[in-house]
UniProtKB/Swiss-Prot annotation:
Residues 169-335 are annotated as: DNA-binding region. ATP-dependent DNA 3'-5' helicase required for initiation of viral DNA replication. It forms a complex with the viral E2 protein. The E1-E2 complex binds to the replication origin which contains binding sites for both proteins. During the initial step, a dimer of E1 interacts with a dimer of protein E2 leading to a complex that binds the viral origin of replication with high specificity. Then, a second dimer of E1 displaces the E2 dimer in an ATP-dependent manner to form the E1 tetramer. This is Replication protein E1. Its EC number is 5.6.2.4. Keywords: ATP-binding, DNA replication, DNA-binding, Early protein, Helicase, Host nucleus, Hydrolase, Isomerase, Isopeptide bond, Nucleotide-binding, Phosphoprotein, Ubl conjugation. The modification Phosphoserine is found at residues 90, 94, 108. GO terms for cellular component: host cell nucleus. It is found in: Host nucleus. Pfam families: PPV_E1_C, PPV_E1_DBD, PPV_E1_N. Residues 148-168, 609-633 are annotated as: Disordered.
Amino acid sequence: MADNQGTEEEGTGCNGWFFVEAIVERKTGDIISDDEPEDVEDSGLDMVDFIDNSVSQVEGQENPQALLHAQQLQADVEAVQQLKRKYIGSPYVSPVANSEPCVEKDLSPRLGAISLGRRSAKAKRRLFDKAQPPPNGHTDVEAAVEVNTEGTDETETDQVQTVSGETTTDSLGRQQITELIHNTNIRVALFGMFKDLYGLSFMDLARPFKSDKTVCTDWVIAAFGIYHGITDGFKTLLEPHCLYGHIQWLTCRWGMVLLLLTRFKCGKNRLTVSKCLGMLLNIPETQMLIDPPKLRTPAAALYWYRQGLSNASEIFGTPPEWLARQTVIEYSLADSQFDLSKMVQWAYDHNYIDDSIIALEYAKLADIDENAAAFLGSNCQAKYVKDCGTMCRHYIRAQKMQMTMSQWIKHRCDLVEEEGEWKEIVRFLRYQHVDFISFMIALKQFLQGIPKHNCILLYGPPDTGKSNFAMSLISFLGGVVLSYVNSSSHFWLEPLADAKIAMLDDATTQCWNYMDIYMRNALDGNPMCFDRKHRAMVQTKCPPLIVTSNINASTDDRWRYLHSRVKCFCFPNRFPFDSNGNPVYDLSNKNWKSFFKRSWSRLALNDNDNEEEENGDPSNTFRCVPGKASRPI
């Protein structure tokens, strides 16, 4: 037993040991009696007592059967241990042992498990679990059966026994998907498979979005490993979500492959699209490539157009305008060159004078406006934006300078669409104990720019609503705000050159000293010279000026030369708020609009130009775009 190496034949057939106990009466060299002839036929009667069936054993007598059984049991244990080390992974070996072999662990897992450092007690999350039995009850049985028959040494091995036909197909599908998942970079594998199937890169049709939160209506999707039964009804499932769909199906070793160009009914980000299609296709999000299409690449548009003509594609809905513009001849002929005058007219109509706002808002019109699309296709966008903003500022400034105060107030009233309540303004003035008649007289002279009445001072304790009242009036009339913090610059009064009304908030002692020394002529309402940065100085009349302060300049002897130039109103009470923190008196644009309409005649704002417009004479609307000749009837 000890001489036989290996245990390949143990436990696999009927080749066990049996024990024979015999009594030997003769030894080598004994003389055989002649009374026992050798040719006598053996009848078996002399073998009756050959096997000892007695149960009782003499105490202390050696039992060879028990000894042999113990030796065989020890050999079996050693053989099983060798098989376990050969075919079963040791629980003490790390999962990375396959990539980083270790001699000590291979020789002895227990020795490899010994560590001086403290190991983390946290369980490591396994990214990919081994194949588990499917929920339908079908399993794959792998068995190795070795049969050793008498008279032959051949070994028959059955590798895999499949329980059902469905299990074989599902197993192959799971094996292919597992192969895809276990790739080092899944996205690279998907890109490679897409290029092998379609002959072009996925990024030739789509543009990358780095953020998964960016919203878009048009998307290009490539999905892999789809079950073939979904292909028939996918179009029906997709139609409720989309306005347009271009569907292509191909097959590969991973299953069905979908290439989809779609326009959703509302904007979606990449996460929302992946969840929606993952639910419809019954695949994980990692098996999809999702990016928006290239909108300005003729080659990409031509690909979708040519594929739509073949019978390999299913199309529903109206094609997007960017696709039709690059493939339909009618749209191609309609493309025209960029016209700056149209852009300037658009900015003037919307009262856009900031370059950044002009650039952003006009770029949004590229899908519906031909001139905006030509603007995006130009290499001089920055120059066009700068020129457009400059021209708009020139037009608006010239138009403002030509208007009288009554025309300007009417223009500002027309910009407010809502109707308010003029009593809110009157109630606030009464709450501050301001004589309404005196205030209306001062406001009338203030708006007309009469000398010595060109400045109104609102003074009082803090938190009485002085700045809120003045800011609301300046906001409605479209005025400018000056800050004394810029008084060290020669250009801090430059905004007064283009304003109809101005405000100086929170004038301190230093500010009043500056006004007493340098701005007496401005408070009179007489023409004065303003220095402008990088431009020549301009001479113009100072617009009406509202000043808020905690100091009453009309009673301080330090500024006695300003007493006759400033009309003062005191706000003694704190500005009230309700329980929700909202102001009790709403000083909004709609209420100021109602106030000026109600007090139009009291403020002497009637003008001949306004009367002509009220009598039916239309005003000339500014147009910087040449008109088109109408067809004869």
